[in-house]
Design a protein with these regions (language model features):
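A short hydrophobic beta-strand element within the catalytic core of glycosyltransferases
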Residues: 253-254
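Short hydrophobic beta-strand element within catalytic cores of glycosyltransferases
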Residues: 275-278
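Conserved catalytic-core segment of nucleotide-activated headgroup transferases in glycan assembly
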Residues: 164-167, 178-237
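Extended catalytic core of nucleotide-activated donor transferases of GT-like folds
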Residues: 44, 48-51, 60-151, 159-160
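Aromatic "clamp/platform" in nucleotide-sugar-dependent glycosyltransferases that forms part
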Residues: 258
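A charged, aromatic-enriched C-terminal amphipathic alpha-helix characteristic of glycosyltransferases
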Residues: 312-350
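Conserved acidic donor-binding segment of nucleotide-sugar-dependent glycosyltransferases
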Residues: 19, 290-301, 309-315
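Short alpha-helical segment that forms part of, or immediately flanks, the ligand-binding pocket
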Residues: 244, 267-271, 282-286, 292
Length: 351
């Protein structure tokens, strides 16, 4: 199991206890975060590539730990994502010699093990944030978060996640996703098929809706993309920069996941004007306006019928996609996301 029992830090606090916060801070209209105070040096890990890419739109420098041969979690600056100059590859052997302003943890092992292996004592006393990407696994409502520290900040990526986790005494806030709008990519939908984009679906089981996908694919034409998609008869991985244009030709985007955080792939599909068909679970229930920007339901039979309707009516699909794009650009604007993260970093560092 990924989760362990709650861990109480034994490090001395770096300052006064943080004030509990909830809800995402909103960007002030007309405020340019590039003109704010000095750039901060943030140490973090390459945990989710697309999230890291959007995170680096914040006006700071991000140092990502790397190991030889780039094993999972230690890829550093790698892959096909068009990283900016503010993402700096940092070998773990060099971390203790660096000066940082803040440590951003994104996984239990990073907090429980890596900081003691690769950071010096002074670095471990720096302001710290734990970014929780996931819903609680072992129990949906009664699972205590493993970070138990009134001097850290726990960031959840959706209001649903924050609701379900027992965050204990750790101060929390929600920073909802943000995504960039691809230049020159717009929904076409000429291909009478649906698209599913999930990594490693074959080995992630019922939680990610592998069985739901297979039943839906038996009823309507669906293509699966993502890492190891070939194992389930899919098309394989599409590079992040090419995925929007590739997805735009499909009639709709199908999200079969039962229980997880709101996927960035859904938001990216909405950004280009794709209608969404999804299970009405987790944060998805607040994102899709049923019958307006797509269709959500807990009945697989109903969702299959809706997918068939979209395959038969291209214009209706386009109308739903237009509404999905408006929602995405209002709620998941990258400028708001970057401003929220800038505010979080400056809150813990008091800079």
């Amino acid at each position: 199991m990924r989760r362990r029992k709650p861990v109480e830090t034994v490090l001395e606090p770096y300052g006064a206890p943080l004030i509990c916060m909830s809800g995402a801070l909103r960007a002030i209209p007309g405020n340019n975060i590039q003109d704010m105070q000095r750039r901060l040096k943030i140490l973090t890990w390459h945990t989710h590539g697309s999230y890291l890419y959007y995170l680096t739109q914040a006006p700071h420098d991000f140092y990502v730990l790397s190991k030889p041969h780039r094993p999972p979690g230690y890829g550093g600056r790698c892959g096909h994502i068009p990283w900016g100059d503010n993402l700096i590859d940092l070998p773990v052997s060099a971390a203790k010699d660096m000066r940082f302003d803040c440590i951003l943890f994104q996984d239990d092992d990073q907090y429980l093990k890596d900081q003691f292996l690769y950071l010096n004592e002074a670095q471990r006393r720096l302001p710290r944030i734990y970014l929780e990407h996931d819903t609680p696994r072992e129990h949906p409502t009664d699972m205590r978060h493993p970070i138990d520290d009134p001097n850290m900040l726990l960031v959840h990526v959706t209001p649903f996640n924050a609701l379900m986790w027992d965050s204990g005494r750790t101060p929390t806030r929600v920073i909802e996703h943000g995504a960039l709008v691809p230049d020159g990519v717009n929904y076409d939908g000429r291909l009478e098929r649906g698209l599913v984009a999930i990594n490693h679906l074959g080995r992630r089981g019922r939680r990610l809706g592998g069985d739901v996908f297979l039943r839906a694919r038996a009823a309507v034409p669906l293509d699966l993309v993502g890492m190891e998609a070939e194992e389930m008869g899919g098309l394989g991985e599409i590079e992040h920069a090419q995925l929007p244009a590739f997805a735009a030709q499909y009639r709709f985007f199908f999200h079969p996941i039962r229980y997880t955080s709101l996927g960035l792939a859904v938001i990216e599909a909405m950004m280009i004007g794709m209608p969404i068909v999804a299970l009405a679970t987790t944060e998805m229930a607040t994102v899709i306006d049923n019958g307006v920007s797509g269709y959500i339901d807990t009945s697989e039979k109903t969702l299959t019928a809706r997918m068939r309707e979209l395959l038969a009516d291209h214009e209706h699909a386009r109308q739903l996609g237009d509404a999905a794009r408006r929602t995405a650009r209002e709620r998941f604007d990258i400028r708001r996301f970057a401003a929220d993260w800038d505010a979080a970093f400056r809150f813990v560092t008091q800079c």
